[in-house]
């Protein structure tokens, strides 16, 4: 009988190719962005992407896929914190406009 420590568990035999991993990363980035726009300000999402690209890709010279992976991790953490802090929109999202309720009412006397 073969040593069980030297056998590869089912599903982990290297069947996933690099191309499939990159495709998975693309799908996850798109999915997190679709969900994040319902919970976080678009400006924040855009700034996280820009700063991730500048820091990991431009400054450190990391690959595009690594930069996307780091962005994905940051956005997952941001969404986790948002929900942990008491997001009440777990079912349907905050709606268009993200987390902002809209402009404040005008001051009294100016209506």
From Swiss-Prot:
InterPro entries per the UniProt record, alphabetical: Lentiviral_Vpx_assoc_factor, RetroV_VpR/X
Keyword NADP in record: no
Intrachain disulfide bonds: none
Regions annotated as coiled coil: none
UniProt name for this protein: Protein Vpx
Top-level taxon: Viruses
Protein's UniProt keywords contain Cell membrane: no
Biological process terms in GO annotation: symbiont-mediated suppression of host innate immune response; viral life cycle
Location in or out of the cell: Virion; Host nucleus
Gene3D superfamilies documented for this protein: 1.20.5.4730
Role according to the record: Plays a role in nuclear translocation of the viral pre-integration complex (PIC), thus is required for the virus to infect non-dividing cells. Targets specific host proteins for degradation by the 26S proteasome. Acts by associating with the cellular CUL4A-DDB1 E3 ligase complex through direct interaction with host VPRPB/DCAF-1. This change in the E3 ligase substrate specificity results in the degradation of host SAMHD1. In turn, SAMHD1 depletion allows viral replication in host myeloid cells by preventing SAMHD1-mediated hydrolysis of intracellular dNTPs necessary for reverse transcription.
Residue numbers covered by motif Nuclear localization signal: 65-72
Keywords recorded for this protein, A-Z: AIDS, Host nucleus, Host-virus interaction, Inhibition of host innate immune response by virus, Viral immunoevasion, Virion
GO cellular component: host cell nucleus; virion component
Similarity comment: family membership: Belongs to the lentivirus VPX protein family.
Species this chain originates from: Human immunodeficiency virus type 2 subtype A (isolate KR) (HIV-2)
Name of the gene encoding the protein in the UniProt record: vpx
Region Binds to human NUP153, annotated ranges: 61-80
Assembly description: Interacts with the P6 region of unprocessed GAG. Interacts with host VPRBP/DCAF1, leading to change substrate specificity of the CUL4A-DDB1 E3 ligase complex. Interacts with host NUP153.
